[in-house]
Amino acid sequence: MTYSLDFDARALKEWQKLGDTIRQQLKKKLVEILNNPRIEANRLHDLPDCYKIKLRSSGYRLVYQVIDLEITVVVVAIDKREREQAYRKAGERLS
C-alpha cells in the first residue's frame, strides 16, 4: 500500500530553503518511504509514530510521522543533525 505525502507548513518552508542536491537526495529516500514507512531502525523512541531519514554526508535529518488512518506520511521537520535540532523541532511541533 502506497502512502501519500504531506508537509507541516513549517517543514515545507524548511524544504524550500534546502539546496537542490540535498532536496534531491531526500526526495529519493521519501519515494522509498512511501511504500514502506515503518522502518524499525529509523524509529524515534521519544516521538510516537515518528521516524527519521538520515543524510550522513550532509548531516541533515528529516523527521516524519506515519498516520495510518489517513494512509499519510507527514514531514514534520528538516534540519541539521547538530545539537539534535531536527528532533527538537519535531518534538515541539507535535506537542
Q: Where in this protein do the model-derived segments appear?
A:
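Arg/Lys-rich, positively charged N-terminal/basic patches that mediate binding to nucleic acids
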Residues: 1-28
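A short, surface-exposed loop/turn module that caps and links secondary-structure elements
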Residues: 31-55
